[in-house]
Each structure stands twice: as structure tokens, then as C-alpha cells.
Amino acid sequence: MDVNLKEYFESVKGTGVLATADGEGRVDTAIYAKPHIIDKETVAFIMAERLTHHNLQTNNHAAYLFKEDVPGYKGIRLFLTKLREEKDSELLYSIRSKRYAGGKEEGKPRFLVFFKVEKILPLVGAGRDPEKD
């Protein structure tokens, strides 16, 4: 699926869910905002020190599902691999200030987690086996 992620996410509204699993395969899902598009193959999410971030310390794979606010089931799925993260960085707060009012919350670390986009699939269909599609 050939999608310009920057254009896509700027043009649609909807709900995102980020799925992670820990090193033993225990799965978690969490509602997440749209990703920050770094470049054609890289996205980033701002995370608090919670279960999703914890899981990514032992398993660098994640999946992001985005359902558009339209009738039916329209959206995309991103298969992701964690590249790196930054804790309370200037880049994190400059990105965050573009979307959200307010700055750094004292005593609550934030992480800017970068992912390589391995594959993009539609929300429904086309993807029985992510290794073969």
C-alpha cells in the first residue's frame, strides 16, 4: 500500500490504537494520537512512562491501527519496529508544543520513541500474513 503518511494524517480525523507486547508476548493496546511523521519511513510517538513504553524495552515491535471517523471501516495499519528513543528532549517538546498547549510536566518523564515503518496495510483486508504480503 503506497501512502504518503504526512498527507494522509493531515487530511483525516479518527482514532488510533498502538499495540505492543512485552518480551514474553503479553499484549497491550492503548489509544494514541496520530504519529509524528519524521520522514517517509520513520514515525514517532510521545509516550509517558507506562505499559506501552515498558513493553518496548523488551520487544521492539509494535502495530498502530488508525480508524477514520467515517461510516464503515476505513483506515490504515502500520507495522513498526522501534529504532531509538529520547527522554525529555528539546525535539520532543518542540513537536509536542505544535499539537498541545503546555510544556514539560514536572516529575513526569516523556519519551519520543522513533519507529521504522515496515509495512502499511489498509484497516480491513490485504494482510493475512505480514511476512509474505
Report residues per predicted region:
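Binding-site signature for planar aromatic cofactors or substrates
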Residues: 1-133
